[in-house]
């Protein structure tokens, strides 16, 4: 009984999290481009040699930039 309650709670938490995350992401193409541009500009301010936000911190350090 306790095990079933745990899995039910876990399932609800996962569904709620996925619902919240999908609402935060723009669905139209222009919105996605704006979001990508914002991330790219923020990353270029932190490390001009890192083009993508998810570049490894070791790459930024090797190029002389501080990691994002």
UniProtKB/Swiss-Prot annotation:
Chain positions listed as propeptide in the UniProt record: 25-45
Subcellular location: Secreted
Extent of the signal sequence: 1-24
Keywords, in A-Z order: Disulfide bond, Secreted, Signal
GO cellular component terms attached to this protein's record: extracellular region
Descriptive protein name: Conotoxin Vc7.3
Superkingdom of the source species: Eukaryota
Primary site of residence: secreted
UniProt tissue specificity: Expressed by the venom duct.
Domain-level remarks: The cysteine framework is VI/VII (C-C-CC-C-C). Displays a mini-granulin fold, a structure composed of two short, stacked beta-hairpins connected by two parallel disulfide bonds. This newly described fold is derived from the same cysteine connectivity as knottins (ICK fold). The name 'mini-granulin fold' comes from the structural homology with the N-terminal region of the human granulin.
Disulfide bonds: 47-55, 50-60, 54-65
KW Mitochondrion (keyword) present: no
Family that this chain belongs to: Belongs to the conotoxin U superfamily.
């Amino acid at each position: 009984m306790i095990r079933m309650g745990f899995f039910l709670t876990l399932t609800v938490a996962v569904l709620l999290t996925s619902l919240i995350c999908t609402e935060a992401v723009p669905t139209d193409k222009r919105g996605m481009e704006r979001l990508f541009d914002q991330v790219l500009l923020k990353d270029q301010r932190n490390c001009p040699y890192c083009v993508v936000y998810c570049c490894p911190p070791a790459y930024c350090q090797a190029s002389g930039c501080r990691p994002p």
